[in-house]
Amino acid sequence: MGLSLLGLMACGQKTDNSGGNSSEGSGTTARESAKETAKAEGENNSDVTLSVSIWDTNQEPGLEEIMADFTKETGIKTKITVVRWADYWTAMEAAAQGGSLPDVFWMHSNESERYMSNGMLLDLTDYIKNSEVIKKENYPTDIWSLYGYEGKDYAVPKDIDTIALWYNKKMFDEAGLAYPTADWTWDDLTEAARKLKKPDGSQYGFCLKPNNDQAGYYNMILDRGGYILNDDKTKSGYDDPKSIEAMQILETWIKEDLIPSAETMSENSEDVLFQSGKVAMITQGSWMIAAHKKNDFSLANADCVELPKDKVTGRRVSIYNGLGWAAAANTKHKEEAWKLIEYMGSEKAQRKQAELGITMSAYKGTSQEWAKSAPFNLQAYLNMMEDMEILPFSRSTVTWEDANTELVTKVYTGELTMEEACKKMAAQMNEKLAEEHAK
């Protein structure tokens, strides 16, 4: 491998809620390995324990239950380690440098191309081709595209996510306001936030962190008809007039103090502020349901609804993404790792993932059960699937995302206007994209 993963991952990571011999293979193809597995069918796997890494503690209990089913069926044990998102990729970098990546782990579109292009992930192409369980047509095509590189597949889709608006019913009742509906526009949200804000700063109408692109302003940009990244990943759309118009809605919230300061939000996540009664509304991804359904405050006060529409276009878009189950290229347990990945992507496991309320599943037709898993209007998330666009990504996603967050933060602090920030974001993104295509 010409470049170490360390060098490729030296830039900072998005911290909220986004080595050498690891690429060396055994010289055995997946097809040959599958044949060897068939020969060894029936052998005792009880001595194998697969290391599994994820970043969400809320999903851990449900995944442990599903993996316990896997162990009963195969004899292969698993051990889940949770590393929070803020530290996950740093930990993976260190593991990659030491040649000790977990056997199986979550992969994200922000990092997938770098891992795939540097040979860090086990090639699953032939495993998938020969599987009776994993059929590509049963999952969204765009999710497969996140984890494919040069005609090869390196992960099996784990889930799919959409975005919805959460609101505090008690705060709306106290303000004498009707609850948000699917007919709302972003202007309706702004007007409600003005009425929900308290002058003493004890309560804000809305909350959106500077780095909350996926669950926040990406959706607004697409609603208005702007774009973040063009189809061939060569140009940023932040300087498009429609993108700027959409981002100026956020600027209004900032200028009118309808949302907490950047400093306050740097110390507290949006869900913490919402669940502590400090903000009346937030936008959140479907991956957060596990946290809400075990939170007494949310259970007593919260519900969700579809995102607002754009008043000009009438469009209501949800950015969507999906994680992938991947394996280390140098795992000592390739066959067992594949068996776990295959099981976790199966209709059976995907349906149980939805039924347990872990998250929406990638396997088509299984997420309806997820909507019944908690006493909230989770149908809103399924309805958001009517108009979805995949989360923008390129080989250097993390570098331009983090750089853009720094500029958006300067709008929060009054150092830049939103138009200035958008034009600067476009310029620096275009530089990063040009570097990608020059390699």
List the predicted regions and their residue ranges:
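Short, well-ordered beta-strand elements
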Residues: 46-57, 76-81, 103-104, 154, ...
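Extracytoplasmic "Venus flytrap"/periplasmic binding protein-like
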Residues: 69-139, 174-176, 273, 277-281, ...
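Extracytoplasmic/periplasmic substrate-recognition and gating elements
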Residues: 51, 68-73, 77, 175, ...
